[in-house]
Amino acid sequence: MILTVTLNPAIDVSYPLDELKCDTVNRVVDVTKTPGGKGLNVSRVLNEFGETVKATGCVGGESGDFIINHLPDSILSRFYKISGDTRTCIAILHEGNQTEILEKGPMLSVDEIDGFTHHFKYLLNDVDVVTLSGSLPAGMPDDYYQKLIKIANLNGKKTVLDCSGNALEAVLKGDSKPTVIKPNLEELSQLLGKEMTKDFDALKEVLQDELFDGIEWIIVSLGADGVFAKHKDTFYNVDIPKIKIVSAVGSGDSTVAGIASGLANDEDDRALLTKANVLGMLNAQEKTTGHVNMANYDKLYQSIKVKEV
């Protein structure tokens, strides 16, 4: 079983408009509301792939109830209730553009943070892999992911971390390391304080930096150019075919789903990397975030090339 953690979920609201007019009324006919957050995208893709998934995070108010009630029944909902209202994130789709309005989310109390920590420990009993995705809610310290990873490691669970900024830096500088991190080039550049390119020799060198010591897998997204990965002392380039992209939103989360599935099933390096990239590509071919059409899985799987470099 795979446990997905979304500490700062949201209701994602989509407002499609022919034209966004400022300082006046804009009427929307076709409104879409879905449970949002990186970890919930991971949950949905794992569920569609056929994995057993348990989803947790911090939710509150009517919007928190909406998230719980609108996840597929086959996803085990194990969310922790807080006093604040779960945030709403609005995407206005207009004239080929996407304007986003993102709420910060609720402020968690010390008691709520401690309560979730105990809740997390309890949920580990029957899982093999834990995914930790997205931003931390207000009130949580930057090193909170580090705390959850330490608990997971002590219980013999594999962890996949997909976050950025201070939360990622705190984990890299901490004592307890995740099994996998999945930065993109921009996030890698931010961590290292220098601009990184798709040059394989340069990537090889930086991924051996002491900053990444103790992390078994480092999987760097190169966007449409695939992936550069390090597993222990072996490096891989994953070459992916060109596809028609409908929406790339959520493709990174779908890739995390593939990584988690590969770890849960003890797959070899090539199988794990191939599965992860196929699920990311399948999501990019769909309008709905966190959704994959499994009918196209085998064809794409055969087109992925994983090379040791």
Curated annotation (Swiss-Prot):
Functional pathway: Carbohydrate metabolism; D-tagatose 6-phosphate degradation; D-glyceraldehyde 3-phosphate and glycerone phosphate from D-tagatose 6-phosphate: step 1/2
This protein's record includes keyword rRNA processing: no
A single Gene Ontology CC term: cytosol
Catalysed conversion reaction: D-tagatofuranose 6-phosphate + ATP = D-tagatofuranose 1,6-bisphosphate + ADP + H(+)
GO molecular function: ATP binding; phosphofructokinase activity; tagatose-6-phosphate kinase activity
Membrane-spanning ranges: none
Database matches in InterPro entries: Carboh/pur_kinase_PfkB_CS (IPR002173), LacC (IPR005926), PfkB_dom (IPR011611), Ribokinase-like (IPR029056), Tagatose/fructose_Pkinase (IPR017583)
Keyword Nucleotide-binding: yes
Keyword annotations of the record: ATP-binding, Kinase, Lactose metabolism, Nucleotide-binding, Transferase
Annotated CDD domains: FruK_PfkB_like
EC number annotated for this UniProt entry: 2.7.1.144
EC category name: transferase
Superkingdom, natural source: Bacteria
PROSITE patterns per the UniProt record, alphabetical: PFKB_KINASES_1 (PS00583)
GO terms classed as biological process: D-tagatose 6-phosphate catabolic process; lactose catabolic process via tagatose-6-phosphate
SUPFAM superfamilies: Ribokinase-like
UniProt xrefs under PANTHER family: 1-PHOSPHOFRUCTOKINASE, 1-PHOSPHOFRUCTOKINASE-RELATED
Assigned protein family: Belongs to the carbohydrate kinase PfkB family. LacC subfamily.
Protein name per UniProt: Tagatose-6-phosphate kinase
